[in-house]
Structure formats: C-alpha cells, structure tokens
Amino acid sequence: MRFDVITLFPELFTPFLASGVTRRAYATGLVDVRFWNPRDYAEGNYRRVDDRPFGGGPGMVMMAEPLERCLRAIRADRGEAPEAVAPLVMFSPIGRRLDHDGVAGWAAGNGAVLLCGRYEGVDQRFVDAHVDVQLSLGDFVLSGGEIPAMALLDAVARLQPGVLNDAGSHQEDSFNAALDGLLDCPHYTRPESWQGQAVPAALLSGHHAQIERWRRDQRLAVTARHRPDLVEAARVAGRLDRADEAVLAKLNGLL
C-alpha cells in the first residue's frame, strides 16, 4: 500500500518513520510513504503557498494552485487508472472522527493521498474540487495535519501482517472486534508483588479458562466504567452472553 503525504514540513516525519515497531512497515515498503512539498510546485522567487484570506481576518490560507500542481504530480507518479484513483484525505476539525473501524478500513485498502493543512486552512475551492474524505482526531485544533497523518499511518502500519512481534497482538487491542469492541483489560509483569500490591491470583493460576474469564470480566468492568456506550453497543450487537450480563449487573451496584 502507498501513502503520499502533502506537507510543508516533511522533516517532521523523519524520526517517526525510523522509530518504534512500525518502522518495519516503512523500511520494508510494506507501507510505502512518500512526501510531496507544495512549495516545490509554487511559482515565483519566494515559492509562495499561502496568502491572506478574502474578507479579512487573522492568519493565512493555503493557495489552491500549488496544491493542485502537487496533486497532479502525485497522480502522474502513481500511474493510477481512472477507476482506481487513491482518495485524497484532508485532516480537518469538521472531518469524521477517526476510530478503530475507520483505521481497519484504511489498513485493508491500497493507500491514499494525505493532505496536511496549515495556517487557517485550505482554499475551499481546492477542497470542493479534490478532497474525497475529511478526518479528525477529535474536538480540538492542531497546528497542522502532520500529527493526524502520523496517527493514521501508525495505526494502519501496525495492522499489517508481520509488523508486530506477535501476529495476534492487535487482535487484543481496545475496540477490536475480537474483543467485541470492548476496552482492553489491565496488564501486569514482574515482580509478583510491588510496593505491597500483588498480581491478581487468577493470572498466576496457570488455568487458561480462569485467566480468560478474569480478563473478560476486567474488560467489561473497565469499559463499563470509562466507556459505557461501548458496552451498550456490544449488547445491541448480541455480543454479550449471560455470564457477561451477570458481571455487569454486579458492577451496576458499584459504579
């Protein structure tokens, strides 16, 4: 899969691509990431890519023409058939919030062109003409789209086969369908006792069924406490059995 990133600051991605477990995906080309600076497609001695907004107001707006030239170069480099053009994704506060299901969809695809906006935003005429999808990380504003782009790339990369040390690691992530969309359970490691706090006995029992039941109960408890909407979604989807409901009934008196 291939992601082409349109950014005025490609250097921000250098440590990101070279660090952590997901670097394998980028180093091997399993996730091919290429960078395009719209300044390279701007005209004039100053290579200007932004200008003042019509109507006045603070800040600057990214100009449509350099972005379109940049996008045109990307399309030519990708050599895409008209019916298989990669979607252009722009990160914006008005976009759909990126979640696990969305990441899974991108991870199963062939990639995209990611537009990292800056300043007050992008000329709306370019957005209307070329942007296919708008995504957001949440109800807050960042200085640019680079951090959301990194978040999407990292989330997609770790779902690719062979990237994580344990192929099944992501199957036990929070929100995963394998966990019925619940949050993950607490985790413990050595020593068995730390500052007077012991590891839960179930995890030391060696009894796999008991361990799995404990983990399931903990997932239910954590999710009910922090994201009750996910519990209700699992219930509506028919993913909770009688044992789960019994655990939740006990929790209701404690939360």
UniProtKB/Swiss-Prot annotation:
GO CC aspect terms: cytosol
Location comes to: Cytoplasm
Q: Which GO terms describe its biological process?
A: tRNA N1-guanine methylation
Q: Which UniProt keywords apply?
A: Cytoplasm, Methyltransferase, S-adenosyl-L-methionine, Transferase, tRNA processing
| Pfam families listed in its UniProt record | tRNA_m1G_MT
**Annotated residues for binding of S-adenosyl-L-methionine:** G117, L137, G138, D139, F140, V141, L142
UniProt xrefs under CDD domains: TrmD-like
Per the record, what are the reactions this protein catalyses? Answer: guanosine(37) in tRNA + S-adenosyl-L-methionine = N(1)-methylguanosine(37) in tRNA + S-adenosyl-L-homocysteine + H(+)
The main place the protein resides is cytoplasm
Q: Which GO terms describe its molecular function?
A: tRNA (guanine(37)-N1)-methyltransferase activity
Q: Which InterPro entries match?
A: Alpha/beta_knot_MTases, tRNA_m1G_MeTrfase_C_sf, tRNA_m1G_MeTrfase_TrmD, tRNA_m1G_MTases_N, tRNA_MeTrfase_TRMD/TRM10
EC numbers on record: 2.1.1.228
Is Ribonucleoprotein among the key words of this record? no
Keyword Lipid metabolism assigned: no
**Role summary:** Specifically methylates guanosine-37 in various tRNAs.
Q: Which family does it belong to?
A: Belongs to the RNA methyltransferase TrmD family.
Q: Which HAMAP family match?
A: TrmD
Record's subunit section: Homodimer.
Q: What is this protein called?
A: tRNA (guanine-N(1)-)-methyltransferase
The opening ranks of the lineage are: Bacteria, Pseudomonadati, Pseudomonadota, Betaproteobacteria, Burkholderiales
Protein encoded by which gene: trmD
